[in-house]
Amino acid sequence: MLSVHFWQTPVRPTDAASSLANGIQTPTHRRCQTSNWTGQLSSRTLATIAARAAAPWLQTTSAASFGSPPTSLWLAEAPPQGLKNWAVVATVAVVPTALGPAQARGNLFQATLWPLRDQRGTQDSPSAHHCLILSLKPGQGLRMEGGTSDMNSQTSLTPAEDPVSRPQDSPEPRQQLRPLPEPSASTLPEAKYVETCASAGLRRESPQTLKLPPEQQASRSPKTKAQDEPSGHAPEAPAPGESPASSQCLPSQACENDFSSSSSSSSSLVDSAEDNGLSKMDDPTKLLGVLATSSSSLGFESDPETSCRQHREEAGDRAGAGEDKRGGVDDGIASCKDIIAKSHSKRGPLRNEDAHYITTHEIQLTEVEQGMDFDVGLASRWDFEDNNVIYSFVDYASFGGSDETPGDITTEEDDDNSCYVSTTPSTNTTRTPSPISSDLARPGAGSSGRDTSSTEVGSGPSDSDTVPPPTGPGTATPPEPLLELREAALGASATAASSCGSAASQILLSIKPTSRAINEPSNVRAKQNIIYAAKHEGDMSLRVSSAAEHNSSSLKQNSAAAVAQDHAKKFIAVPARLQTRCGAIRAKELVDYASGASSAVSELDDADKEVRNLTSRAFRSLAYPYFEALNISSRESSTTLSEVGFGRWSTFLDLKCGGVGARVEQSLLRSSAASVAAGLRKGGGTRATADQLYLQTKKSQTKALEFVVSKVEGEIKHVETPLCFQKQVQTGSRVVTLLEPLNLRSESKASSATGPCRITKGSSKGPGSVYTDDGSETSESSKPASRSDGPQKKSKFASSLLKNVISKKMQREHEFKMERGEVTDTSHRNPPSTKETEGPPGAEKPWERGLQRQSSRHSEASSEYTVVSVSDAGGEGSVVGSKSPIFKASTPRESHTGSGQNVSDGHTEVCEIKKSASETVKGIFLRSQNSAFRTWKEKEAEKLEEKAPVGRLKLRKGGDWRADLGEISASKSTIMSRLFVPNIQQTPKDKQPEKQATKYPAAAAQATSVAVIRPKAPEIKIRLGSVQQPSSDFNIAKLLTPKLASGSSSKLFKTIEDNSRTQQKLFRGGDNLEKVPQFQVRDVRDKSKASGPLHQVRDVRKLIKGSGDSSDKGSVTPEQGLTGPKPRQLTPASGGSRSLSPMVIMCQAVANPREEGVDREPREGVSQVSNGGRLLNSSPEGTVLVHRASGRLPVATIAPNKSEQGSYLPVLKIVSKASAQRTPEKPKEEEAKEEGKAPKPARNALEKLTAAVRSMEELYSFNRNEWKRKSDPLPMMADSHVLSLIASEEKEGVAGPEGGDPDKLAKQLGQVEERDTGHKGGVVLRAAPIERLQRRNSNPSTESVSARAAAFENMARERPRSLYIPPVHKDVERTQPLQPLPPLPGNRNVFTVSSSSTQKTGGVAGKFPQGPSPEGLSTAKGIKAQGLRSLKISPATRAPPEDASNRKTAVSLEKSNSDCENYLTIPLKGSAASAELLGRPGASRDGPPSSSAATLCSLPPLSARSQVPSNPKGSQVSGTSRPAWRTKPDNHRETVVAAPTGPQSPEHTPTAVYHQQALPFTLQGAQPQVLCFSPPGMPAPAPAGPAAVPTDPFQQPQPQQTQRKMLLDVTTGQYYLVDTPVQPMTRRLFDPETGQYVDVPMTSQQQPVAPMSLPVPPLALSPGAYGPTYMIYPGFLPTVLPPNALQPTPMAHTPGGSELSVATEPPSKETAAAFTEAPYFMASSQSPASSSSSAPAATPQLVGAKGFAQLHGKPVISITSQPLGPRIIAPPSFDGTTMSFVVEHR
C-alpha cells in the first residue's frame, strides 16, 4: 500500500493555501476535507483515478515543491503557501505475466512542493520548485524523490506540461519526456481519468490529462487533479510526447526533466492560473515522467526503455535540477537500464496484460515534530509540508518483499518495491551518502538490486548523490530505477534541500525493498553502527535517518557507512504491512527459509510472496490501527522521542517492519552466519558496526515481527514507546525496543536496546543476533551498559507511556492479532520453525530452564520482558526457553541452535543488563503487571511443573515452548505477547488465569495490559494444556491432534501455535469485547475445570467421539485435536491440564461476557482450527477450536455449561474441525445426513460424519425437537436453515447423495477429509446447528442444548453466515441445509476443503471464517453470520430448479431471518463444477484454484484464503465465504461475518447476484470484504430468481465462461473474488492459497457481458476501516449489470435487504438504498458518488459508492475498465493518517 498523507489543495492556489494545512486536496482540486485526509479523498477524485489507469496522485499544493537543490522542501510563501502538490501516480509497472501480479506495482507518488515564490515567480522557477516524487517501481517499491526542478529539468517537463515553461526549460527534457509519451496507450485511461478530473472540476486538466500518455496515466490522474488547479498545466498535458513525462514528472525530481519543466511551466501557469493547480499538474507530470520511466516499467503503455530513458532523462533533469540531478541522471540511466531490464521482464507481460495484479497503495502522512524528527530524520517532517506532518510514503505492496511475495520478477525488485519514504531533513547529508554507501555496500552485500533499492532518496548537504543514487539505485538494482530516479531526484533535491536545510531538504522517501533489512541505523548517534538493520538485506530497510544517522552519515560517507546509514535512513513510513508481512512470513519463512542467510533474494521470493500474502491480509487490519496509532504516536513519538524523533519511532516501526520483512526474519532464523554476512554486506562488512547493525537488523527483524504483533494488537503507541526506547537504545536497542515496547518492557527494551545483546550479537551475529532480536541481542552487552542507563530512563518514561499505550495497544493488538489469524498464524508458522530451531539445540529445553532462562530469557526479556528475564528467568525461561522469546523462538531458536552458547554468554551478559532493565521495566511497566509478572513467573513454574507432570516436556520444549510461543502467538504474535502478554500468558498458562485475572484487574493499566495479556495467557495456558493432552483444549485440539493424529511435531507445534493463537485471538476478541470477560475466561476456566458441565462436555464429547469422533480422531488430526484430544482433555483437563480445561470452559462458560468476542473468535478459532488444525493459519482459531471442539462436540451433551459458548461451540465444532464439528452437529443431521453420507464416504469420513452426525443428531434432534422448541426462534431458524434445509434436502433425497457427496468430497479432500466430510457433507449442515448455537451465543440459554439450539437456529436465522454453498454439487439441497446450519464453518470447511491443500486457505477458510465470526460479531448473530459466511454454492449442474428451490429456501430463510441474510445460496454452475469445488476444493485450491477460478474471498480482514472451492469451470465458486482475515477480521468483522458471506458468495459467477445481507453489511459496516466479479462474459441472465441468487440462471449460465478467483492483492494482502471469463485476457493475480499466480481473464468486453451483482460490503469499500478491501475489476464487472442479475429481489428476499441483489440497473431505489445501507459496490454507470441505485451504466462502478460514502463517509472509486495500466479500483480510503487506494495493474 502506498500510504501518503498529503494535503490536497483546492483548485485555486488561494484555496490550496487555505486548505493546505488541514485539508487534503485531491488532484482534482476537490478539496477532500480540510482536515486530515482521513478517508477524505474525494470520491470523484478517487473515482477519477479509478477511471484512469493510474492511481490518483494526491497533490498537496503546487505551492510547495522542492526548492532548489539547496532549498529544502518548504511550503511556498505564495498564496498556496504551505500547500504542497502531491501527485500520487499509481503507475504500476506492468509486470510480465511470468513475474506475477504482485511484482509490478510501480506507483508513483509525487509530491511536488513548489515554492510559490520562485525565480520565475512563485512557482515558475524550476529550481525553486522542489519536487518530491514518490515512485513505486515494480522492483523497487516506493521511491521518493525530492528534488528541485531545475530550469533545465523543468524545461523538459514544462514543455510537456506548460508551453510557458517549455521555453525556459531545455528541449532535451522534453525529448526525455517524449519517450514518456510512449505509454500513450494508457493515454486513454489517463484521459479518462483526466476527463473525470476535469469533470470533477479540473479546469484545464482534462485536456492536459487527456494528452498524458499511458505512462503519465498514473501521474495523470494526480496530474489531472493538479490540473484542476493549473490552467496553464492543461496545455502541457496536450503534448502527448512531452505530456507524459511532464505529467509524470511533477516538479519532483523523479521526473526531473519533464517534471521540472512541467513544474516550471506549470508553476508559471499555475501561479497565474492556479498556483496549486499548475504545480500539482506539474508535479504529477514530472512524477509521471519519473513514473513514465517507472510507469513504463510499471507497465503503462510506455515502453520500459522509454521509461528508462525518461527515467534517465528525468534523472538527468533531476541531476540538473539538483546537485545530484546529474548523478540522478546517471542513476536514472543505470536505473533505467535496470528498470528496463526488469521492466521489460515484467512490463512486457503486463503490456500483454498477462500480468494483472492489484496493488494497494497507502500514502501515509504522519505528523512529526518539526524539530525533533528533523534530527531523527526518519520521520522528519517534510519541510514543504506542515512542519509537523511527515509524509511517510510506504508501498505496502512493496513491503517485505511485497512484490516478491506475489512472485514478482525479482526479490531485488521486490526489495525495491518496499520503499519507505521518510523525510529526514537532518539526515540530509547522511541520507545521500547513505544511499551511496548503502547501494554500494548493498550490492556488495549481494542483493545489489535490493541494496540499491534501499538507497534512500534523501536530499542532504552530503547529497552529492549524483554518484550515490546512481550507485545505489542505478547500479545496484535494475528494479531500482525508479528508486534511483527518486533517489537522484531526491538526492538532487536533497542536495539542493540539504543546502537549504537538512531538515527541510531531507525529504527522504527511502524506498527500500522489503528484502532489505530494516535500516535501523538508529537516530541514536551512538548506534549509527546499528544501521545493521539496514544491513540486513532481507529486512526492508526502514531507514530512520536522524541526527544520529546524520552522524552516521559521516561514517556512512563511505559506501559501507553510507549503506548502513542509508539503511538506517530507510524508514518505514508504513511498517504496518511490513510488520504483518513479516509476522506472517517471518514465522513461515523461518520455517521455510531456515537456511536463508541474509534473506537472499531467491529465498525471499517465495517467502516474500507468502509474507506479502499473509501480511497483506494482516496488514489490512494492521495498517489502519497502526496508522491510527502512528498518528497518535507520531506526535508523541516526536515529543517523547524527540531525540529519536518521529523518524526514530518510525525506525522503530521500521525495525519491526524490517523484522516483518520475511527475508530479514528468515535470514535471522535461517542463519546467524548468513545474517552476519548479510549484515556485513549490508553494512558493507567494512565495519563492525555494520555487523552490529546487521545483527540489530536481525533483531530488528525479530522486533519487526513483534512490532507487527504489537502493532496489530496494540497501536503504534506501542511503537511509540519503543521509539523512546529506540532513542535510548538507538538502532540496536531500537530493534529490541521495537519488541520490547511491544512487550511493554520499556526497561527490557532499554536493556535490550542497551546493547548488551547487541555486542554479543555482533559477536554471535547469527544466533546472537537472533537472540538479541528476541532478547535484546546478547551482543548488545557491551553497548547497553552505558546505553542501559539512558534507555532505562527513557524506559521508565516509555514505561509509563507504554503502560497506557501498551495496555491500549496490546488490547488492540490482541484484538487484531486474534481477529486476523495473521499474527497468530505468524506465530503458528514461526513455531514450527521455532520448534525445529529449538529441537536442534537439545539443551534448549534445559537451556530454556537454565541458561536460556538466562540468555534466552533475557533475549526474550527484551522481546518478552526484561522483567521476565529477571523475574521469570526460571519460570519463563524454563517454559519458554527458546520459545519464551517469541522472536527468539524464531530467531533465537536459530541463535540457540547456531550460537546457543554464544547467546548464553551474551544473554548472561544481557541478563545483567536486562535485569537492570528488567527491574526498571518491572518497576515502571511491570509496576502494574508486576504481580502478574511474578504470578506469571510462579505460574510459569507451575506451568512447567504442570507440563512436566503431564509428561509433555517434549511438547513443553516443542509444544509448550510453542505454547509459550503460542502464548506469544508465534515469533510475531509471541513477541507481541511477550511484549506485554508474556507474563500474563504464561501466568494463565499455568493456573494463573484466575490469579492473574484477579491481579490484572487490580491494576487498571494492568487490566488493560492483562486484557491483552489475558488472551495470550489462555493461549499459554492452553499451550500448557497442549503440552498436556488435556491441558489445553486448543492445544490438544491443535497440538495434541497434530501430535497424536498427525504426529508431526512441526504440525503439532503449528497446532499448538494455532491453538495459542486461536486462544490469543479468542482472548483478544475478549479483550476487544471486554477485558473482564477475559478475566472471566480465566476464572471461568478454573471454574470450568471444576464445573461438571465442562467435564460433561468432555465426557459427552468422549461419548460422541467414541461413537463417531473416534474415527474422526484417527482420520483427521484437526478433528482428533478437536475431538480426540478433547476427551483426553476431559480427563486430564480437570487435573494436570486444568488451565486448558478452564480455557475450554472459558470459551464455553465465559462466552457470556465475551459471547461476541470470545464466541465469535472461538468460533473463528474453531474454523481456523479445522482448517488450521492442519494449517498454521488456524492456530489462533485452534485455541478456540479446541474450545469449540470441547464445547462443540459436547454441544449436544453439554449445552448448559456452554450455552453461550454452546451457540458458538457448535460453530466451534463446525469450524473447529469437520470431525469435531460433525461430531456435535452431525448427530443432529446424522440420521438424515448420514444416510446420504454413509454410502459414499470413506470409512473414516463416514465414521466421522456418522459420529459427527450422531452428535449433531442429538443437537439437531434437540434443535428440531427439543432445542428447536426450546428456543422458539430456533425452530424456524433450524427448519429454515439447517434443520429445514437439512430436512428438505434430506427429504428431497439430496441428503443421501449430498451426504455421500460430502463424504466423497471429504475423501477427495484427503486432508480435509475429516473436516471436509463434516464440512462438505454433514459438517456444513452441522455447522449450521453449531452456528445456531453460536447464534445462541448472543442469547445463551440456561440450557446448553436448548440454548444452543435456539442460539444456533437464531444465529442461523440471524446470520445466514454460511452462504448456502452446497458442499457437494450433487447434494445441493442437502448442502444447503448443511450449509445453513454450519454454512460458515461448513463453507469454511468447504473452503478448507477447497483450499485445504492450499492450506492455509483451508485453515484460513476454516479459521478466518470463524475469526470473522468471533471477531466481528458484535452479537452471536455476527458470529453466526461469519460462521455461516461460507457460501452455499449449489451446483448449477444440479437441477437448476432444485437449486433454485434450494436457493429460494435459502433466500426465504434469509428473508425470514435477517440473520439468514448472510446465507447466500450460490448455485454452482455445474454439478461437476460443484463437485470439483466441493470435492476438490483443496486440490483446486492448490492447483486448480486458478483453473477453477480459485475464489478466495477477497476478505482482507477475513481470510480471503478460505474460499469456496474454486470451480474449475471457473466462477462456480461464485461466492466464497470470506473468513475474516486473521489480521483484522475479528475486530472489524463483527458483522462482516455475515456481510462477507454475501459478497463472498456471488451467486453463480454468471450473474452472481450476491444476496449478501444488506443488513449484515450494514450492521457490520464495511465488514464484507469479498469482491465478487462475475465474468462479464456471463451475462448470466438475471438470475431467474434474482431474489435468491437465481440458482438456475447462475448455475446454468455459462459456468465455464467465467471463473471466480480469489485473487490476492499482494500489495495489501486483500483478496478479491473475481469472476472472470475464462477466455478473455487474463490478469495474473496471486492466489495465496496455491501460492500461484492465477491469470484472471479480464477484458473490457466482459464487463458489459455479465452483470455482476457485486454487493461489496462496506468494509470492502470502507477504506477507513479496512482500506479499499474490494476492488472491482472493470473487466470483471460488466459495464451494465443485467437488471435480472442485479434485481433487488435478493434484497427483498433477505430481510432488511440483507441479500443485496446487487442489480446495478434494475436495482430500484430501495435496492440502491439497501446498497447504500449495505455498502455494496455495484457496477453502475453512476459515478461513485452517485446513489448506489444508479441506473446500470456502461462503466461498471461501485454501486453504493454513494451509499458507501454515506455509510462510511469514504469515497468510493468508480472503476472503469481500462485496457492497461494501473488504475485505482478501490475507493481510496483515508483514515487521517494514511490514504490507501487499490490500484489494478494490467
From Swiss-Prot:
Q: Which residues form a coiled coil?
A: none
Residues of the region (Disordered) are: 140-191, 203-329, 400-480, 746-907, 1081-1180, 1218-1242, 1291-1348, 1362-1460, 1477-1550
Residue stretches of biased makeup (Basic and acidic residues): 306-329, 810-828, 845-861, 1153-1164, 1223-1238, 1301-1319
Phosphoserine, modified sites: 1179
Q: Which UniProt keywords apply?
A: Methylation, Phosphoprotein
Mark out the compositionally biased spans (Polar residues): 149-158, 248-259, 1131-1140, 1167-1180, 1336-1345, 1389-1401, 1504-1521
Which residues carry the post-translational modification Phosphothreonine, per the record? 721
Residue(s) carrying Omega-N-methylarginine: 1767
- For whether the record's keyword set contains Protein biosynthesis, the answer is no
Where does the record place Low complexity bias?
232-247, 422-438, 1105-1115
Bias type Pro residues, positions: 467-480
Instruction: State the InterPro entries in the record.
Output: CEFIP, DUF4585
Output this protein's name: Uncharacterized protein C4orf54 homolog
